Amino acid sequence: MFGRGLPPLKFGQIGGDGWSTVLADPGNRLIVANAHRSEPRLRVETLIREELLTSRARIEDLERRNRAAHAALDRLAGKAVAIPLRAAAELKNVERPLEAAVELLEDMAERAHHEHEPAVVEDERCRKLSAGDQSGQDAGDDDDAGVIRILKNGSVIPLWKPRTGAKDFHVNFVTMAFAASGDGRVGFGSWYRALQSQLLDSSRGMERILGVSQDGRVSSRLVRAVIRVLRSAAEIYVGHRNYSAFEAAVMCLFQYDAAKRELADAKDGRGSSSGNEPRPASTFEEAIKLVPHYLRALQEDVRREWGAVSYAFDRTKLPQKFFSPVDAKKYSNGALSPHIVYRLFKARGVFAATGREVTKEEIATVDPDFSRFDDPIANLSLAFFPARRSPLSLHEDEPLMRAAIDAVALMMLLQRLMYNSDVYANSMANRFQAAAFFEGRVTGPVAPASGDVYGDRLSGDGDPIRAPGSRPPAAAEATLSGDGSRDVVSLDNNLVFLFDKYLCPMYRYDNRTEMTGFFPGLAAVCLVGKVRGVPSPSSAGDCCSSLINLVDLDLRKTENTGAGAAVVLTVHDAITYDMETGLSRLLSVFDVKKHMKPVLRAMNVETDSDLIYFLCLGCLPHHVTIA
């Protein structure tokens, strides 16, 4: 408070017997001396004595201390803010080489696994071909399908094994898309950016998990997590089953077509179908290839129902939080009845009658043989899958029946989205250029030959690698001359090609995959389509709260190891319910492709070729400057 060597600060009379002198002392003390006494008496007082300090001095002292405390707090706050930034930078410096090392190790392990087999497989194939074994040739042709060889980090990786290839095909494609971009950036549309923004806003600490950079580009971890969640949307998490819902759906469609054909033959008095009908399937894979024909027959009967068509179940009779009934395998009576697919299957005998619906006494007069209780799906499952040795009894497993109906409805939506699609448009209009990501033949389907109504001889045109939207020169010349105008009407040809060249190989490699596992983009369309009215691109991400919750759970799976089964089921089954809601609404729309066009653009879909790739892959990467 006082400097060294300052003059006295105050003189005052003390009790009339002398003057006191206030001197400055280096020790910040006040020395008060009596000047009239021969031997001055010194009294030392500290500065904080109230009787020596005025009110102003105390206030000034407290203000100085307050300012000093504020300065110390500001310095501490600055250090506290800087510490997480420095720690995050250090963590990123540590995580980047670790992630690169993990990806490298996974790639090396995958290569080692694949390179161990090709020589043996190739020798076996050559032996079969030399012996004239047609099955070996067919196996080779299947391995050359478009989904077998992909380009990853500049190297060709043959996907030989089921459990290492097709099961992770979609996730590996995302990794490959980011790797193929090099130093550039890839964008996936505003829909993925909206999902990332919502996830960052609703979940603390997600920036570190996703590794989001300051430029706001879409995280590869987010895209992979979204693809995993979309693929699981139609899966049943409760119970163990020998058959998937996709397999049950294909068998139901097969039986429905067989029953309809039998009824038509009985009415016409013919012993065989017309020449335009395809040959009946003798194996399950042949039945998969004929699904577009089965769907066409089903759609004809749906149109005959006029206004009494509903693609929704009775939610009042279904569990509110879970897909499967608690401690049971059956719903309340009549829960599935409003759905048009259920009603048609029931009318054709695809779903057998049960004791809850009718008794033997009630149908004895009209059906003395009780044929209504016959279960054709159980017999068909044993015929298609004799090695499983257990029949598929849908009437005893209503959650699987519900999932099978959902699978049929998803196929119907897929057919409507792809109907009359034109993959021969100008390839420069495509947002997704497949040639940048796939190696080998990247070709679209061609028009069926004369007499090949159901695409038995559909194949690639044999041109070198190119984007699938490129039109073959011969077809382009025919169109310009006017002779090929009918080729523009593709009908279901692209769907036939997709089931033959994409879905069959994928099912062969993993026969437990559901419809959303084959077409994750179809699940995304259903989730966005659950909003009433025409969805807008700005609100495309707002209606996916269930998707956000499951993505958050997937990304935090290492932190949520203690989460109960009820929590996982609730979060997962919420997205299944939203998918069912969107599916029922989209199937009720007259022109679903036009209805969803604004949202599809938010998903990077501009052309029919983009739409087909998005339905199969779940995302469409394209090169951008700012992701």
Swiss-Prot record:
One example of a Gene Ontology biological process annotation: symbiont entry into host cell
HAMAP family: HSV_CVC2
GO cellular component: host cell; host cell nucleus; viral capsid
Annotated stretches, region: Disordered: 458-480
Region span, Interaction with major capsid protein/MCP: 1-56
Family: Belongs to the herpesviridae CVC2 protein family.
UniProt name for this protein: Capsid vertex component 2
Keyword ATP-binding: no
Function: Capsid vertex-specific component that plays a role during viral DNA encapsidation, assuring correct genome cleavage and presumably stabilizing capsids that contain full-length viral genomes. Participates in the interaction between the capsid and the tegument through interaction with the large tegument protein/LTP.
UniProt-annotated location(s): Virion; Host nucleus
This protein's record includes keyword Cell division: no
Positions in coiled-coil regions: none
Keywords, in A-Z order: Capsid protein, Host nucleus, Host-virus interaction, Viral genome packaging, Viral penetration into host nucleus, Viral release from host cell, Virion, Virus entry into host cell
Chief location of this protein within or outside the cell: virion
Subunit annotation: Heterodimerizes with CVC1. Interacts with major capsid protein/MCP and triplex capsid protein 1/TRX1 at the pentamer vertices. Interacts with the large tegument protein/LTP.
Alphabetized Pfam families for the sequence: Herpes_UL25
Underlying gene: CVC2
